Design a protein with these regions (language model features):
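Amphipathic alpha-helical interaction surfaces in cytosolic regulatory modules
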Residues: 3-25, 29-34, 40-88
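Amphipathic alpha-helical binding modules
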Residues: 89-93
Length: 93
């Protein structure tokens, strides 16, 4: 699971914050050609488009929407249909 140091944080925003979190905790840890799941902490209830584009931008650039639909899954207990939300917001990049 992703570690968000500030447990009081419930919303994630900011392209640079997304990139920083991805670089520190995900990059090099997953094989994008195999199924993988990103787990957000339970308290997170909102992902801003800016955060999504920063965090998932590299994955999206490397494997595209088709690759993400096939291999990517996400667990975010407080966000309804998080995979669709993320993919839809990446289409705006």
């Amino acid at each position: 699971p992703l570690e968000i140091k500030d447990r009081s944080l419930t919303k994630l925003a900011g392209n640079s914050y997304g990139r920083k979190l991805f670089d520190a905790q995900v990059d090099g840890q997953i094989n994008l050609n195999e199924p993988f799941t990103i787990v957000f902490p339970e308290q997170i209830d909102y992902l801003a488009s800016s955060f999504i584009q920063g965090f998932f931008g590299k994955i999206y650039t490397e494997i595209g929407r088709e690759g993400m639909e096939k291999n990517f899954d996400v667990i975010a207990p407080k966000i309804s249909n998080p995979k669709k939300t993320i993919l839809d917001r990446l289409m705006l990049m």
